[in-house]
């Protein structure tokens, strides 16, 4: 863009765990949804990756905040500052003045009017002049490459950090949906609680996240895909002495069982509310998994065996919603399902 560009267009996947921003069809920001603030002035000190490095390590003068919880804004001021800081990271080149922003932002399909207003207000305070919202399952479907305006049913299960979005989409609309606040953060919390109860070792949220990445699983038998045990280091919760505990994927699969079962129940509930003709399409097409939770080892096989419908992991599940918001940004005049 040149010196006299009046409008800048960006698409944003505002996630509980990570925020992704697209500009000119390119991902220009992909950073943790964390902001560090000065406790005395509430001014931003760091955002994204730099702020995450401070998370759980801050001194009394700094507070690090994850502004979104369960997929929605929990701290309005922190969210506004985080959005503003991340938008500044977009490489916009030299300009004589700050352009107005046209934005498309992904939001959970179960959002209330108050929650939608909070996202819109945060975006406007961060510089947005023309703000559109898109439900995340719709964005994920577009990002996967599905024709959301076609007269056939497709089901999307988007397992993010704060919420799991389940939706049946047909003719450019969401026919039935189920949004539950069980997702990646809950799996991480399950691991923290399990390590404390079973192994007497205190682990941070960040360490629990590493355990999930290295040995997280939805099945107790992964066959040849089984990962090696992961060594967890942390203090004994009673004596505070350092410990080293090897953890295998089978025990993590057991500790995640209750949360995964809740996701299964939510999917079955959405299927129960699906009209028969669209249900037949879903059985034929399969169900698409998106979001970071789609990467949990064995989840697609477990769901396929449980529900008896094929589950397909999106080609790039972490970026499905972001890609979809980017495509929606180029079609704001065509996509009637965008919300202003």
Where are these regions (language model features)?
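Nucleotide/phosphate-binding catalytic cleft detector across ATP-hydrolyzing
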Residues: 1-159, 167-287, 294-340
């Amino acid at each position: 863009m040149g010196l006299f560009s009046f409008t800048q267009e960006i698409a944003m996947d505002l996630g509980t765990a990570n925020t992704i921003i697209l500009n000119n069809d390119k991902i220009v920001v992909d950073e943790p949804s964390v902001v560090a603030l000065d406790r005395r002035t509430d001014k931003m000190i760091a955002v994204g990756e730099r702020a995450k490095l401070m998370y759980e390590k801050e001194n009394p003068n700094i507070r690090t905040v994850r502004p979104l919880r369960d997929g929605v804004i929990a701290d309005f001021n922190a969210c506004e500052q985080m959005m503003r800081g991340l938008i500044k990271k977009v490489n916009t080149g030299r300009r004589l003045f700050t352009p107005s922003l046209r934005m498309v932002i992904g939001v959970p399909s179960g959002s209330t009017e108050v929650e939608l207003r909070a996202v819109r207000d945060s975006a406007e305070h961060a510089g947005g002049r023309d703000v559109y919202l898109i439900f995340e399952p719709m964005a994920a479907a577009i990002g996967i490459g599905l024709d959301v305006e076609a007269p056939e049913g497709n089901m999307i299960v988007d397992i993010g950090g704060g919420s799991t979005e389940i939706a049946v989409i047909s003719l450019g609309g969401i026919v039935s949906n189920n949004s539950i606040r069980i997702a990646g953060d809950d799996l991480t919390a399950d691991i923290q609680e399990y390590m404390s109860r079973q192994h007497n070792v205190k682990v941070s949220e960040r360490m629990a996240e590493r355990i999930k990445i290295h040995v997280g699983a939805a099945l107790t038998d992964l066959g040849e895909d089984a990962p090696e045990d992961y060594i967890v280091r942390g203090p004994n919760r009673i004596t505070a002495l350092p410990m080293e505990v090897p953890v295998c994927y089978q025990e993590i699969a057991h500790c995640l069982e209750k949360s995964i079962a809740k996701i299964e129940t939510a999917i079955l509930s959405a299927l129960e509310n699906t009209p028969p003709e669209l249900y037949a399409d879903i059985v034929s097409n399969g169900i698409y998994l998106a979001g970071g939770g789609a990467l949990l080892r064995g989840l697609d096989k477990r769901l396929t065996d449980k529900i008896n419908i094929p589950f397909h992991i999106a080609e790039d599940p972490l970026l499905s919603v972001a890609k979809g918001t980017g495509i929606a940004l180029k079609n704001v005049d065509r996509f009637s399902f965008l919300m202003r």
